């Protein structure tokens, strides 16, 4: 049976929950067209997160890897276009590490583009009435670290696995502690991720529609 690996993070930065894991764990063992979804939690720690991700890939042998992370302040489902080869942590990770201007992979490429049909995914999620967009930056914290490490692995192994990263907003119960911050219900995010998985599995060539940014 084919499998999809979907990951979320443990809480970080003083939050009591991480919406990525709260949502992702609901998809564990979900069946989609004969494909089984397997959920795994990653530590919010440089290095350790990639170790856990690589172990999960080796174990599950998925055809698709979707890494999900929290982006407090964003209002929609943000599907990442690119990961860059730098760790530049504004805050320490959960193990107290705070790399500044360090490459994720020494002598690795400056960036990798996603292996997901991101515009088709955005279009499908929007058609379901859920806000979504293509994001041009995954940041320089553990989320970007995981996305770059994932795509580097897939590039190095010439693997046909599809892979990429999606950022999601705060949950409403988090947003009450961040006045003015947008949020999205876990129910809406689950629907969006189910659609993202389905579209990524079905589509090999992305939609030719605008998804860029002015700034």
Curated annotation (Swiss-Prot):
Catalytic activity: Release of an N-terminal pyroglutamyl group from a polypeptide, the second amino acid generally not being Pro
Compartment(s): Cytoplasm
One protein family per Pfam: Peptidase_C15
Active site: 80, 143, 167
SUPFAM superfamilies assigned: Pyrrolidone carboxyl peptidase (pyroglutamate aminopeptidase)
Family statement: Belongs to the peptidase C15 family.
Assembly and oligomerization: Homotetramer.
Identification of the protein by name: Pyrrolidone-carboxylate peptidase
